[in-house]
């Protein structure tokens, strides 16, 4: 049997022409680019190295310069002249039995002695800062070394400088994990993963506490002068505590150089209302809409304090960052936003009642 023919179907529109998909031009990579390829992270952009970091490096890691040598030489000549003149005055006063002048010479000698002692103490502090930079370079070399015998002594010296007792659980775990067949790289890596996080955790807590206090203080303070003074005090105190935590004592000269950084931080805090403009990248739209102007400025000051603490932590730390263990600004950012949100909710609850 023959099947009946199907009726004809007429289409109103024109036939669709097959379009060839358009591809981008081929892009080739050489072997060097392929080996150094790193995927971009969308969660957090890397911290921009700006003026704050440069000043921080100059403050905690002082460098020698020609002008500094000239000033030190002039001060040395002036000090020698003062001492020589003082000796001559003392001899003349003793020969002429001028007891008043002799008492003045004795008082001047005490003042000069105190000044020399302060200079020596300051020099020791600067020397400790330079030694910490050398220790960090030495640790970086040991982390790439396959030799033996230097890693254990180096780590024990770091533990002694940090004030970690031999009976500390973290140090005991490190002693139990190392043996004679391990090279310096493995010994230092174990120290960085078992002992160093104890100090890093304390530094993180100090940074979180200072950043939170700066955020909440500026969020509730109505006076800009109080905000500036509070930020200056908290930033200097944070740097001193982090340096002391890692076994570094800052002298007067280092604090004067750090004061320049604090002034920059205060200037940034005065312009922290820019946080409201870019707040959509940092927090959800709902929370940004509920934040007041003072709260946004407080978050900006808190983030800058946290950034200052991270840089101080990096420069005072005896070991370089390994395995991406460097604290990120985003971690402190989330804590600050959560604390501000909790504070705002607590402020609304009593008013609603």
Curated annotation (Swiss-Prot):
Main location: membrane
Recorded topology in the membrane: Multi-pass membrane protein
Subcellular location: Cell inner membrane
Cellular compartments per GO CC: plasma membrane
Transmembrane intervals: 70-90, 100-120, 213-233
InterPro entries noted in UniProt: DUF697 (IPR021147), UPF0283 (IPR006507)
Assigned keywords, A-Z: Cell inner membrane, Cell membrane, Membrane, Transmembrane, Transmembrane helix
Coiled coil: none
PANTHER family in UniProt: UPF0283 MEMBRANE PROTEIN YCJF (PTHR39342:SF1)
Family, per entry: Belongs to the UPF0283 family.
Name of protein: UPF0283 membrane protein YcjF
């Amino acid at each position: 049997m023959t099947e009946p023919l199907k009726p004809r179907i007429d289409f109103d529109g024109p036939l669709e022409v097959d379009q060839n998909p358009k591809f981008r031009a081929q892009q080739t990579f050489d072997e060097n680019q392929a080996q150094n390829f790193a995927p971009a992270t969308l969660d957090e952009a890397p911290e921009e190295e700006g003026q704050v970091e440069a000043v921080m490096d100059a403050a905690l890691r002082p460098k020698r310069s020609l002008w500094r040598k000239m000033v030190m030489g002039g001060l040395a000549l002036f000090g020698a002249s003062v001492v020589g003149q003082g000796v001559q005055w003392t001899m003349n006063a003793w020969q002429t039995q001028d007891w008043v002048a002799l008492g003045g010479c004795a008082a001047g000698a005490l003042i000069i002695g105190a000044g020399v002692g302060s200079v020596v103490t300051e020099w020791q502090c600067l020397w400790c800062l330079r030694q910490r930079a050398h220790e960090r370079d030495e640790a970086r070399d040991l982390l790439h070394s396959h030799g033996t015998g230097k890693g254990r002594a180096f780590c024990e010296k770091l533990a002694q400088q940090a004030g970690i007792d031999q009976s500390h659980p973290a140090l005991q775990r490190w002693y139990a994990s190392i043996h004679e067949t391990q090279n310096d790289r493995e010994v230092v890596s174990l120290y960085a993963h078992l002992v160093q996080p104890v100090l890093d955790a304390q530094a993180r807590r100090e940074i979180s506490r200072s950043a939170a206090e700066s955020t909440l203080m500026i969020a509730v303070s109505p006076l800009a002068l109080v905000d500036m003074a509070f930020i200056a005090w908290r930033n200097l105190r944070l740097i001193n505590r982090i340096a002391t935590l890692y076994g570094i004592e800052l002298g007067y000269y280092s604090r004067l150089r750090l004061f320049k950084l604090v002034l920059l931080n205060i200037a940034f805090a005065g312009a922290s209302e820019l946080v409201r403009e870019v707040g959509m990248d940092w927090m959800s739209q709902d929370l940004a809409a509920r934040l007041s102007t003072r709260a946004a400025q407080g978050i900006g000051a808190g983030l800058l304090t946290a950034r200052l603490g991270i840089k101080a932590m990096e420069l005072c730390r005896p070991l370089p960052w390994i395995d991406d263990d460097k604290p990120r600004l985003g971690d402190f950012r989330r804590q600050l936003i959560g604390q501000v949100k909790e504070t705002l909710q607590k402020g609304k609850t009593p008013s609603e009642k």
